[in-house]
Amino acid sequence: IATAIAILALLQPWIIKLWDRFFRKIHLNFIPTAKIKLYYNRSGAYVYLGGVIESKNKAAIVKDIAVKVIRKKDKAELPLDWSSFVVPVFQSVGGNPVTTSEIARPFKVESGSLYPVFVEFVSTNTQENSRLAEIYSEIAAEIRNIMQPNFTIEEAKNTLAGSNNYRNFRDELLQSFYWRADEYVIVLTITYNDTKTQQYRFKFNIDANEAAAFKGNIEKSLQCGVDEIYRVPTNLFCPQKEFIVDDGK
C-alpha cells in the first residue's frame, strides 16, 4: 500500500497536467463594459464596442473578433470584422482630448484572467467598400474643381451640393443606407485557438428620430472634404446603445 501511495504521489502532477491538457475544456466569456456605438461616415456603416474577455480553465489565443448586424424587418446583414483596438482613455494633447488606437491582432488571454478589448470594426463587403472609395474619390475631384479662393465654407458646400455628381451620389447612398428605423441583432463571434468559436447575441433598436438624424451623416460625409479645407470639424451623429442580450423574441 505504501508503495502504491508513493507511486500515485509521483504520478499526481503528471495526471493533473494530462487532465488539464486533454480533458478540461476552455470556457471563453465576453463581458460587455461599454455601450455599442453606431457609425456612418465615408467608410460606410460600422460599429464600435467594448468589454472584457475571460478565459477559464486554460489560456486562449483570440484569433479574430467579428460582428454581423442583422436588420430584423428585411434581414439585411452588415458583415464586419475587427479593424483596430481603441484605447478608451482620453489623453490631452495641446489641450485637445485624443484617443490612441492600434491595428487589431491576435492576443492571448491567460487562464483565470480578464482581458479588456475595445474594438472598432470595419465592413468586409468588398464590393460596397470599393464603391464608396469610387464615390468619395469623385467627390474629392469635384471639390477641387468648384473651389474658389474667395468662397466661404457655406458657398463651397452649396456649390458642391448643386452639382450633378453630388446629387446622384447622395441619392445612391440614401437608397443603400443601412441604419433605418428598425430593430437590430448583433451577432458577436470570437474565434480562438485553432478554429474554435464562441458567439454572443445582443439587440438594439433605432427609432424614427435617430434614423432621420443618422441620414444627415450622408450629406456631412459628402461635404467633409470641404470641412477639411477650411479646417473645421465634421460633427457626425453617432448614437450609443446598451448591450441587451437577444432572447430571440
Segments (PLM) and residue ranges:
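Short solvent-exposed strand-capping/beta-turn motif centered on an Asx-Ser/Thr pair
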Residues: 54-59, 195
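Short, solvent-exposed loop/turn segments enriched in Ser/Thr/Gly
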Residues: 44-50, 183-185
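Acidic, serine/threonine- and proline-rich intrinsically disordered appendage/tail regions
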Residues: 156-168, 174-183, 187, 195-249
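Short, hydrophobic/aromatic beta-strand segments
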Residues: 59-68, 78-83
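Membrane-embedded hydrophobic alpha-helical segments
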Residues: 1-25
